A protein has these predicted regions:
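Intrinsically disordered, low-complexity segments enriched in polar/charged residues with Gly/Pro
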Residues: 13, 36, 81-84, 113-117
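Short, low-complexity N-terminal intrinsically disordered segments enriched in polar/charged residues
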Residues: 2-53
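Short solvent-exposed beta->alpha transition segments
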Residues: 42, 46, 56-106, 110, ...
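Exposed beta-sheet edge and beta->alpha loop/turn motif
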Residues: 98-157
């Protein structure tokens, strides 16, 4: 009889832990929010979040108006067709360094492991921004998960 109560207690404890874990999982999902984009790191954060939310129009608004800028259709199609695929990585936006009308933002790329026995890895690079009409705009991002390297490149002749 004591063993039955003990077993029931263990099972109830496990059930409570499972319910708590599920509650935490579902309440934490989607808690990312847009932040002020008056600083370079805010622009990078909001660009990445817009891409992850598939809000390509908002993300496109963060691109600098430079020569050979992709059209909105080219930009959107790169994500829709999978040329640029952000699903296998995450970004940690770090500090920015501003020098006049240019800025560099530390971007930590966090890559998922390719199999269950590997660990992911982190690679720190920098996004480049320029100030246009008093707003910070992206001129390059270090990752092909969020940026197509053909953007802003002169087309081949």
């Amino acid at each position: 009889m004591k063993q039955d109560r003990f077993l029931v207690g263990i099972l109830v404890g496990i059930a409570v832990l499972v319910v708590v874990a599920l509650a935490v999982f579902f309440t934490r999902r989607g808690t990312q929010a847009y932040i002020a984009d008056d600083v370079p790191e805010g622009v990078v954060h909001n660009y990445v979040l817009a891409i992850l939310n598939k809000n390509y129009e908002k993300a496109y608004g963060y691109l600098a108006d430079l020569e050979n800028k992709p059209t909105y259709e080219q930009f959107r199609d790169a994500f829709i067709k999978g040329v640029v695929n952000p699903n296998n990585s995450a970004i940690d936006v770090g500090k920015s360094e501003i020098n006049g009308d240019t800025a560099s933002v530390e971007v930590g790329m966090i890559y998922n492991p390719s199999d269950p026995f590997s660990t992911g890895y982190r690679d720190v690079q920098h996004a480049s921004l320029i100030k246009q009409e008093s707003s910070w705009k992206l001129s390059s991002m270090p990752s092909y998960y969020f940026w197509d390297y053909s953007w802003y490149q002169e087309p081949p002749k």
